[in-house]
């Protein structure tokens, strides 16, 4: 027999245990078309429940967020029809919901035409030149018409205006007063034309190509005029420089002639020859001045004249080397080498003077002095090279390692620890490729071998000196005295080429004097003095480990500086010991106070910026969690807050608390120790009141939550110590490093039962334990070890 009703309806045919879905269908009479799903809520009007539907009656906090809460959910317009009309008309015009590529683009013609003449006019007024008026007139006369006929007419007008302006410029150069009046009139006319053209051009379009052609034409013509003016100024300047140079050379030549006449009468003929050379130079200079008048060949003539002048200057220097009595200077312009002679020396002391007659010409003097001059020039050039490498090179050339080419060689392959100077310098090198062995040791190598190896493996030849200085760490080329000695060794004494024997004797005498000084200086040190010997003996007597090797010494009693409180273990004066102890206590006290003040300051700053990581460094209470939620709810400037990392139950508690305040939680950070929760406000936060019943239920749960991203404070572990028996303080006994366990324990009394038992068995004081006294007489010593230095 089938059942009357199923499980869902619970007897839909009129059973008393359950109602039917269409219960109202049978009861309704009259209007049967009405939907059976209608309820009492639809029948009743909303006017009966105005208090529930009015959003203004809900409590919302004051401020900006309160205003947002009131307006939330309301329509933009008062009626639905107005809102529908608004959305229908702005369906395709609301660009906020469309992408950029779907938005239409409209091109609107500008009301005013862009005219670049305004900018050009301002620039010409700022940088006014003698051609400024011409530029103004030319740019103002530019037309912006599209038709070709108008552009051609404008070009003709511009050419006529240019001719008129050139005539005006010629008149202005002749008479200044007339130019001023003309400029004023031109300015007035140009301003009128400028205003007229602006009014006409504002209504017309302009052609860029025509404007560009006209501007290029005018700028090229103006550039030609400026170049011509610069060429004229350069020619005048060069003529002035040449005249000044001739005056200086004539003054120098006059001073040289006067010095020769005052020194001796033997150089009269030489002075005449020199005056002839000077006259030739003056003639050559006059010819140069005539050549300079031609503009086309100006550069070539100036180069030839400079070459001739340099050759004549060199000849003059060679002549001065042989015949100047006051001083002999070699290449004095480069400051290379100079040697002074006294005024009273005779002519025979000058090199090359024996072979020269007073009546000889200048050519004979220069020919006979060539060998000596070559030697001098070679010597001076070598010295100049060394001076440049020693002085100028460090300033201009960077150290090794600052250029890209320096990294072609691996510097770690070679290591130099010492250098030996001699006939052939040697380096104490450690290099596997150079030695050919894998042994990590140093070997002596000649400098030539090291240089060959280095150059073959990537070091540039011009960077070799810097490389050696870098590898030897300043052992080579670091002293200026050595470089000066090398320069002195290569210098050649030109005056004493024939006096070799005398120079050798002088050198021997100097060496003997140096040896005597060195020998006498050796005896100054008191070898037999006993200064400090008594202190050394006293130290060896008092020191317990003075003669013990470092590996065998016992450092177990050394107290670290952090844990030191006294200086009793030091053998120092008691007054000094008390002073050090007092200073140490003050230092530790001040350090603790500073640390405490710094932590308090950090906590205050964290409270101001609501940083929970500093406010709650170890744990957070459930009361503090609720206080943070209340502060966030009342603070209108904040919209979110982040809690420290807690365990899973703590995160679940925070999530439940956020639901009570109608807020959301987000998981942030990495999974694990870095995982934390971020609580944020929502729209519902300002619509509804917090569920304080559920909040109170959560408050009755777990009271404390520890942070899992921080280790527990070790001080808390120390406080949880088991109290020792018989100790009033309740703490354990503390031992120091190296203390003997039970060293201060008293001897076992005879009343002890264990001792009485041993005595009855035949044991007496001083005997060993075990069968026939085979055991040890003294107990094994046990030392306390707190450090991690190993077993001693």
UniProtKB/Swiss-Prot annotation:
Cellular component terms per the entry's GO annotation = cytoplasm; nucleus
UniProt keyword Transport present: no
Q: What does this protein do?
A: May be involved in splicing.
Which PANTHER family did the record assign?
G PATCH DOMAIN CONTAINING PROTEIN 2
Alphabetized PROSITE patterns for the sequence: G_PATCH (PS50174)
Q: Does the keyword Transport apply?
A: no
Taxonomic lineage from the root: Eukaryota, Fungi, Dikarya, Ascomycota, Saccharomycotina
Q: Where is the composition biased (Polar residues)?
A: 36-47, 265-274
**InterPro entries annotated for this entry?**
G_patch_dom, R3H_G-patch, Splicing_assoc_domain
Give the G-patch domain ranges: 750-792
Q: Which UniProt keywords apply?
A: Cytoplasm, mRNA processing, mRNA splicing, Nucleus
Tree of life domain: Eukaryota
Comp. bias (Basic residues): 1-11, 24-35
Q: Where does the record say this protein resides? A: Cytoplasm; Nucleus
What is the protein name given in its UniProt record? Protein SQS1
Pfam families reported for this sequence? G-patch (PF01585)
């Amino acid at each position: 027999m089938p059942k009357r009703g199923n499980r869902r309806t619970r007897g839909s045919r009129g059973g008393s245990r359950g109602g039917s879905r269409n219960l109202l269908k049978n009861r309704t009479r009259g209007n049967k078309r009405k939907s059976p799903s209608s309820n009492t809520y639809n029948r009743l009007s909303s006017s009966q429940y105005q208090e529930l539907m009015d959003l203004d009656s809900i409590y919302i906090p004051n401020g900006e967020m309160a205003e947002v809460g009131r307006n939330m959910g309301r329509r933009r317009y008062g009626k639905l029809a107005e809102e529908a009309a608004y959305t229908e008309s702005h369906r395709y015009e609301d660009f906020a919901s469309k992408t950029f590529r779907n938005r239409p683009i409209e091109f609107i013609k500008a009301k005013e035409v862009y005219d670049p003449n305004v900018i050009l006019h301002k620039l010409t007024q700022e940088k006014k030149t003698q051609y400024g008026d011409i530029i103004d007139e030319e740019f103002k006369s530019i037309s912006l018409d599209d038709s070709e006929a108008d552009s051609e007419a404008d070009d003709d007008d511009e050419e006529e205006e240019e001719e008129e302006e050139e005539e005006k410029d010629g008149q202005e150069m002749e008479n200044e007063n007339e130019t001023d009046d003309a400029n004023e009139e031109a300015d007035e006319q140009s301003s009128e034309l400028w205003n007229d053209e602006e009014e006409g051009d504002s209504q017309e379009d302009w052609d860029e190509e025509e404007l560009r052609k006209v501007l290029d034409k005018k700028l090229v013509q103006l550039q030609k005029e400026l170049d011509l003016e610069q060429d004229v100024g350069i020619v005048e300047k060069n003529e002035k420089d040449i005249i000044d140079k001739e005056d200086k050379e004539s003054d120098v030549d006059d001073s040289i002639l006067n010095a020769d006449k005052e020194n001796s009468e033997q150089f009269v003929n030489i002075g005449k020859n020199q005056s002839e050379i000077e006259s030739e130079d003056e003639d050559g200079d006059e010819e140069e001045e005539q050549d300079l008048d031609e503009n086309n060949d100006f550069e070539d003539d100036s180069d030839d004249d400079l070459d001739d002048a340099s050759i004549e200057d060199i000849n003059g220097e060679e002549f001065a080397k042989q015949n100047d009595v006051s001083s002999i200077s070699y290449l004095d312009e480069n400051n290379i080498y100079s040697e002074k002679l006294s005024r009273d020396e005779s002519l025979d002391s000058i090199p090359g003077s024996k072979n020269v007659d007073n009546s000889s010409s200048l050519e004979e003097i220069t020919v006979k002095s060539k060998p000596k001059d070559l030697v001098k020039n070679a010597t001076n050039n070598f010295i100049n090279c060394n001076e440049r490498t020693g002085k100028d090179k460090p300033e201009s050339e960077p150290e090794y390692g600052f250029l890209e080419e320096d990294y072609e060689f691996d510097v770690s392959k070679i290591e130099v620890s010492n250098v030996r100077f001699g006939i052939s310098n040697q380096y104490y090198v450690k290099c596997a490729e150079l030695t050919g062995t894998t042994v990590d040791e140093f070997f002596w190598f000649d400098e030539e071998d090291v240089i060959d190896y280095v150059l073959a493996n990537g070091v540039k030849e011009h960077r070799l000196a810097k490389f050696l200085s870098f590898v030897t760490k300043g052992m080579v080329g670091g002293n200026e005295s050595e470089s000066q000695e090398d320069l002195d060794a290569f210098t050649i004494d030109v005056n004493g080429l024939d006096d070799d024997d005398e120079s050798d004797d002088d050198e021997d005498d100097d060496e003997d004097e140096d040896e005597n000084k060195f020998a006498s200086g050796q005896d100054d040190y008191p070898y037999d003095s006993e200064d400090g010997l008594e202190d050394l003996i006293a130290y060896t007597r008092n020191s317990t480990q003075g003669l013990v090797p470092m590996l065998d010494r016992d450092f177990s009693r050394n107290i670290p500086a952090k844990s030191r409180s006294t200086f009793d273990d030091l053998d120092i004066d008691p007054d000094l010991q008390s002073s050090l102890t007092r200073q140490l206590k003050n230092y530790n006290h001040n350090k603790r106070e500073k640390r405490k003040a710094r932590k308090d300051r950090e906590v205050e700053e964290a409270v101001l910026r609501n940083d929970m990581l500093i406010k709650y460094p170890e744990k957070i209470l459930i009361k503090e969690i609720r206080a943070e939620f209340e502060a966030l709810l009342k603070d209108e400037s904040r919209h979110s807050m982040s809690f420290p990392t807690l365990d899973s139950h703590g995160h679940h508690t925070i999530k439940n608390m956020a639901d009570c305040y109608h807020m959301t939680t987000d998981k942030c950070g990495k999974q694990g120790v870095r995982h934390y929760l971020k609580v944020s406000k929502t729209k519902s936060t300002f619509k509804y009141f917090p569920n304080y019943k559920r909040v109170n239920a959560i408050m009755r749960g777990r009271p404390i939550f520890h942070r899992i991203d921080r280790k527990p404070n070790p001080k808390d572990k120390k406080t949880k110590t088991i109290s020792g028996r018989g100790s009033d303080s309740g703490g354990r006994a503390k031992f120091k490093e190296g203390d003997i366990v039970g060293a201060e324990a008293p001897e076992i009394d005879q009343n002890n039962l264990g001792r009485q038992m041993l005595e009855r068995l035949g044991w007496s004081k001083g005997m060993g334990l075990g069968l026939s006294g085979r055991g040890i007489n003294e107990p094994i010593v046990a030392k306390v070890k707190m450090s991690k230095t190993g077993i001693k």
